[in-house]
Amino acid sequence: YNGETIQVALGKGDYVAGGAKGMPFLSFENLNKLRPMIAGEVWDDITDYPEIAKEMFSGRCDDPVEWATMWKELGADIICIRLMSIDPFKKNASADDAATLVQRIVDKTNLPVMVSGCGNVERDIEVLTVVCEKVKNTRLLINKVEEGEYKKLATAAMANNHVIIGFSNL
């Protein structure tokens, strides 16, 4: 294995991820001493969330900000907000509402935030671009950008000091 990941500062600069020069958890190959960040995943629309999993959160998953706060209390290093409500075939929530929610989570938890879309590539790019433009007091991790669709979103992310996760089917 001869690849490596770059180090990136997330949040307000006080969290650093990456920098590995070997496979995860192989300390004899990987001289990077940063431990992996543990993420707590939050959905903004739990309509399709598994019922059995909802039970674990004691009703706190009904409010995404409260759910993110719970993850912080449990020791999560980063919050991953999955914007399921923006799906055009379901709730079709606005990009502004999504950006407001991300900002509320950032403000309430003071943790780095990874933002994921609903899986509809066109809608994800539209909404995540607005999120990049409106959330400015932290460095977001935008998840994920596919090869043929990255230019607009990458431009918005870079212009606002956010980072993106590239995705490539092998």
Residue ranges: model-predicted function:
Residues W71, I105, V131:
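Conserved, mostly hydrophobic/aromatic
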Residues C132-N137, T155-A159:
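Short, surface-exposed basic-aromatic patches at helix termini and helix-loop junctions that form
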Residues I38-E66, K90-A93, G117-V121, N143-K144, ...:
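Active-site mouth loops of central-metabolism enzymes
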